[in-house]
Amino acid sequence: MRDLIAVQRNSYYTFLTKSLKEEFDKISPIVDYTGQLELHLITSKMELKPPKITPVQAKRQDITYSVGMYMPVQLWNHQTGDVRQQMIYFGEIPLMTEDATFIINGAERVVVNQIVRSPGVYFQALWDKQHVRTFEATFMANRGAWIKYELDKQKLLWVRLDKNRKMPLVIFLQALGLNLQEIKPHLTNREVFERSWENHAVNNTEAALVEFYKKMRPGEPATVHSAKQLLYARFFDPKKYDLSEVGRYKLNQKLHLDIPLSVHILTTSDLLAGLDYLIQLCLDRARVDDIDHLANRRLKCVGELLQNQVRIGLSRLEKLLREKMTIGEKLQPSSLLNPKPLTSAIREFFASSQLSQFMDQINPLAELTHKRRISALGAGGLTRERAGFAVRDIHPSHYGRICPIETPEGPNAGLIGSLAIFARVNRYGFIETPYYPVKKGQVQKSIVYLTADVEDNYRLAPADVKYDREGQICSPIVAVRYRQEWTTCDASHVDYMAISPIQFISAATCLIPFLEHDDANRALMGSNMQRQAVPLIRASKPYVSTGQEKWMVQGVFSKADGIVRSVQATSIRIQHARGPVDYALLKYQKSNQDTCIDYRPLVWVGEHVVKGQLIAQSAAMDSGELALGQNVLIAYMPWEGYNFEDAFVISERLVYEDVYTSIHIEKYETDARQTKLGAEQITRQIPNVGEHALRQLDEHGIISVGSWVEAGSILVGKITPKGESDQPPEGKLLRAIFGEKNQHVKDSSLRMPNGSRGRVIHVRILSRDQGDELPAGVNISVRVSVAVKRVIQVGDKMAGRHGNKGIVARILPRCDMPYLPDGTPVDVILNPLGVPSRMNVGQLFEALLGLAAHRLRKRIKIVPFDEMYHKEASRIFVHQQLKRAALSAQTILYDGRSGEKFDNAVTVGMAYMLKLVHLVDEKIHARSTGPYSLVTQQPLGGRAQHGGQRLGEMEVWALEAYGAAYTLQELLTLKSDDMEGRTATLNAIVKAQPIPRGGTPESFKVLMRELQALGLDVTVLQLESQALCVMQSKLD
C-alpha cells in the first residue's frame, strides 16, 4: 500500500534519531566565563522514555502526548580535577502519533511542510533604467549573512554584505588574505577582474581589513584586530554562519566543486568559483538562475522545523548555564540544568507557529490533504502582501511534484499547495517524482526518482505514449519535455517516461473523474470542496470513480497475520502468532470540526487477516474505499425558477430515507469555581425550577447518558452564591419588613443553546479531589457531548466533484418531482445554465456514465486523461455504455404535479453529490436585542457575538439614491448607536406611542472627542450661522 503520509513520518523519525542529538552536540561542552568549569552532554546515551498514556487518553485528559528526554551530563571542574555525572531530565518533546499528527493539550494538530528558497548561490541578470544589463550573484546561507556580488555596467565588481553599503569586491577578497596571484588561477577570464583590481586594490591585507571595517561599521574606530573578529563572526563562526548540508550540496553542484558535505561554512574556493561564474555570465557563457524553479526551492518538513526550535531553545539554555556556572563546593549538574528554555521553545512552536495548525478533520480526505500540504508562509517564508505573481504561478518544474490545481481561492492562492500523488521528498528536502527509464526506445520496469534539476538534462516522454507488451514505444517520433520546453525527438532518444497520467495532480484532485473535461478553476473548487464533505450516516461508493479511492483509507490496520477471534462494536480481537491483540475502535468521537468519528468493523469471526489489512473503516468509507457523498438521480432543467443561480431543488426522499443525514457532536462544558462568596455547587437543588425540567438529571444534577435534550434543557445543574448587592429589590424589601433571608444562590446551570437538540452520548466529570489537572480556581469540570442528527434542509450547501456547487432552495414532495417514463422520480434538479459558462463538462460525462452503470449494476473506474487511447475516448466510452444499458443521453420527463410531458427531452443522469460542512443550522442567525461595542455603542458583528446586520457604506448609498431620508436616519441613529434614542424608542414601542426623532450617534461623539484630542475646536453651526454649543452640552 502506498504511504501517503511518509513525508511527515520520515522527517520526524530523522529528527528523533539524528537531528536532536546533532543540536545537543553543537553546544557541548559548555564552558564558563573563567574556563574552569565544563559541562559535557553525553548524547550517545540519550534516552527517550515512551509515553505512559495512549493518544486517545491524551485527548480525553486534555494533555500533550509526548516523550520524556533524559541524558547523562558530566560537570568537569579543572581546578579540583573533579568530574560529577548525573542523569538529567531535559523536558518533554511532543510525539507524533501513527497518523502523523501531534496531540497538544488534547487537540490534534498537524505541522505543515514549508517551502523555502534553498541555501546556495544564485545568479541573476538585472536591467537598469537605461536598459543596460548588470549581473549579480547571491550566496544564501541557511543561517547567517548573505553575500551579494554585483557587476555594474562599467564592468566593475562590488560586494554587498547583508543590506549594508556596497564595497569593492577586491577589498573584500584582500581582507580575506588573498592576493592577485592566488586569485588568477581560479578565473577563466581575467580581464574583468584585473580592471577592478587596478581601480580598487589597496597595498596589503591590513589596509584592506581596515577599509572593510570602515564600510561595515562607519563611525567606529577601525583596527585590524576588530576587523578580523568581525569577518570571522560574520562568515566563519559555525554558530553564526551555517550553509547546512543542503547549502554545501547546492554550492558544489552549481560551481562544480568537491568540498566535503560536512564543511558548512564558506571557503575561498566557493567565493572565487562564484566570482568566475559571474564573469562567465557577463560574457554570455553561463545561464542565470530561475528562483522559482523547484531545483532552487526545498521543503522544510516537521523534523527540520522542530530542529530549528530546539536550536533556539538550546541557545537560550546555553546562555542561562554560562551565567549559573560559578565555582561552588556543592555544584551539581542537576542544580545547573533547567529544561524550561528548551521545552518553552518547543511549546511556543506548537502553540503559535503559523505552520502548526489545528487539524482539518472533517473527513479522511481533509486529514490526508492537510498532512501533505505545502505552505510558502510562516517564519522565514513569504507574506501574503509581499508575494508577487511569479512565486504563486505554476512552474514547469512543478510537474509531478506540486499539484497545479489544488490551492485555496483568495489571498493565499499559489502560496499554499499540495504534494502531487506520487511525489516524495529526498534527504535534502527537494521534491522528487518517479519515472520509468527508457533505453533505446524500450520502457524499463524499474522506477527512478528524479529531482527538478536532474530532470532538466533529460528528454522526458509523457505517460500517455503508447508502447507494446515488450515495452517498445510504438511511435517513431515522440513529444518530449526537454529543459522545460516541449519538443519532439526520435523514440530511441527518449531517456525517461512518466509513470501515470495523474502523477502531476494531488490526492484530492485525482478523485475527480473526467477531470480533463473541466476548466481548471472549477477543478480547483471540486478538489477543495471534497475536503469539506460531511461524512454521512450511510456512506456509499460512487458509481463512477478514478480507482484512487482505495489509497485514501482511514481506519484500523492489522499489525500482523492472524485469525479474527471476536468482533464487537468497540473492539476486534485477533489471534497473532505471538498471542491475541485487541484493537480498540473509536465510537462516536468528536472531530476537530464537530463531525463524527466512528469506526465500523470490516472482518468477521474466523477470518484470516494479513499484515496491513484494513480491519475497521471510518465513517466516510464504504468497503474500504473513500465514500464522501451519495449517488443520486439528477436532471438538468429549470423548475419554476427555484434553481436560479446554482440553487438545487431536491426530493423529500433525501430527507425521509436519511440519504444526506449526518451526525455532528457538540461539546458543552461548565466549571464549578471557587468564588469570593464561596464555592459554586453542581446540584439538583436549583431554585425556581420545576420538577419537569429536572426529570433527566441524576442525583448529582448531571444529565443522564441517552437523554434526549432540546433547546433550553438543563445539562448540568449549578448554583452560584450571590452577594447582598446581587439581591433584587423585592428581596431587599422582604428582608427589611420580615428580616427573612431569602436564598443566597442564583441559578447558573448549563443549558442547551437555542436551535440545538440531540441525544447525550458522553458525560465526563473532572474533579480536583480525584487528582485531575484543572485550572486554578476550578473544583469540578463537567463535559457533556450531545450527538445531533442533521438532515438535509433548505439552505444547506451541496456540490458535485466538478466544482458544481449550490444551495438547496426547495424540498419537493416525491409526487411533485419530475419523473422518468418508468415512474421513477428525480432526486435533484440542477440548473442547466450552470454548465456552459463554467466549462465543467466533466459533470455531464459522469452523470451519463453513472446512469449506465446504475442500470448495468456495476461500478466503473476511469482514470483521468484517457485521450491516450484515441481521440474523444471519453465520449465514445460513455456512448458505448449507454448503448449497452439501452439508455439515451436525453430522456422525456413528466411533470409530477400535472402528469404532463415537458416540452423538450432532458439530460438525466446518476451523479455523485456531496453535502458540505456549510450547514444552514450553523449559519442562520437573528437578533432582537444584544450586546453593543463599548466605544462606538454599535451592535457587535457576527453570529458568535449574537451581533446585528451591518448597514455598510454601499447600503447607505442605496438609501441615499432612493431619497429614503427618514429610513436612513433611523438606521444611523435609533437602530444603531444613539443611546438615549434607543431607550426612548423601546419605551415608545411598549407604550404604543410615536417613535421619537433620532439624536446624536455615539460614533459621532467619538469622532468629536478624537478631533478635540488633536487640539481642534469643533462646534456645530445652525443654518442661521450663529454658533451653538449644542454639541458641547450634549458631550458634557
Curated annotation (Swiss-Prot):
InterPro entries for this protein: DNA-dir_RNA_pol_bsu_ext_1_sf, DNA-dir_RNA_pol_bsu_external_1, DNA-dir_RNA_pol_su2, DNA-dir_RNAP_su2_dom, DNA-dir_RNAP_su2_hyb_sf, RNA_pol_bsu_bac, RNA_pol_bsu_CS, RNA_pol_bsu_protrusion
Entries under PROSITE patterns matching the protein: RNA_POL_BETA
Top-level EC class as recorded in UniProt: transferase
Reaction equations catalysed: RNA(n) + a ribonucleoside 5'-triphosphate = RNA(n+1) + diphosphate
CC per GO annotation: chloroplast; DNA-directed RNA polymerase complex; mitochondrion
Origin: domain of life: Eukaryota
Keywords recorded for this protein, A-Z: Chloroplast, DNA-directed RNA polymerase, Nucleotidyltransferase, Plastid, Transcription, Transferase
Biological process annotations from GO: DNA-templated transcription
Cell location: Plastid, Chloroplast
Leader sequence segment: none
Enzyme nomenclature, EC number: 2.7.7.6
One GO MF term attached to the UniProt entry: DNA-directed RNA polymerase activity
One Pfam family hit: RNA_pol_Rpb2_2
Subunit description: In plastids the minimal PEP RNA polymerase catalytic core is composed of four subunits: alpha, beta, beta', and beta''. When a (nuclear-encoded) sigma factor is associated with the core the holoenzyme is formed, which can initiate transcription.
Functional note: DNA-dependent RNA polymerase catalyzes the transcription of DNA into RNA using the four ribonucleoside triphosphates as substrates.
HAMAP family assigned to the protein according to its UniProt record, in alphabetical order: RNApol_bact_RpoB
Similarity comment: Belongs to the RNA polymerase beta chain family.
Name the record gives this protein: DNA-directed RNA polymerase subunit beta
Gene field: rpoB
